[in-house]
Amino acid sequence: MVTERSGRNVKEVRYQPGENTLAPVQTLIKAAGQGRYEFSSRRFSIGGRDLVGWEKAERQSLTLVLLADVSHSTHPYINVMAEIINSLTGYFRMNKDRIGLISLSGAQAQILNHPTHNYRVVTKSLLSLAVHGQTPLADGMQKALAMIRLQKHRSPGSSSLVIALTDCYPEPLTLHSPDPFDEPAYRETVRAAKLFRKDKVPLLLINPTFSHHQEKDYFPGEKLSAAIERESGGRLIKLYRNMEFAQTQPSQGIPPSHRDILRIISGVEEMVGSRRLGEDRRIAG
């Protein structure tokens, strides 16, 4: 009566020990329907052929797409993302997950790795990324969605998750308006965020450049981060800048603190785990 299969019950089948899980209630209902219940003795007459089992859904595989911003402010966190992938390799391999990587650098986002089981190649690509000024955020988000759609077409039962590490200062800018949110790069990013909700693709956004706790004081990148979270139905991890370091080393990215690393690990593990269980509540509606 023990089976290694996990997942939700999807179909009643003939019970086979080791192949499926015994369904006691369904067995009794079937027996009663076949006249195997005696009212006088209040007993069922059940044989081996009458046993009903549950066929389980196969464990869901996950397609994880990483969006990596390689500006000065976010580049110090690239190593953290590579270490997280390495630490979860066994878990990913057990579930036959795929990981893809998109670099937010240059005029257009660059697809460095299509979703693959070769996690070492992905971490190697991550660690090879160099600092680059431009951040084509909207293009990267759209390419991540295209990756997910293609993978869902190939594996209809698979789950998905996009993790974006970015300071949310999209480019290029026209500089024709005093309000950054009138810039095409900002408008297109918000439009791309709405597509995540429409497609029911969960998004974990990690912004390591927050300076303000009050929304009224937000810089444009902080405002855009909040807008992406709101419009996509995803989750935002705000990591606050070490202002003392920023003032003494203005040209360098601020290295992540131990607390920052723990928050990133916790957020990634939570989102990956929730997708494994097929929990779509955060992006419903």
Residue ranges and their predicted role:
Residues A107-N113, R154, P170-L175, H212-D217, ...:
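Switch/connector loops and helix/strand junctions flanking conserved nucleotide-binding motifs
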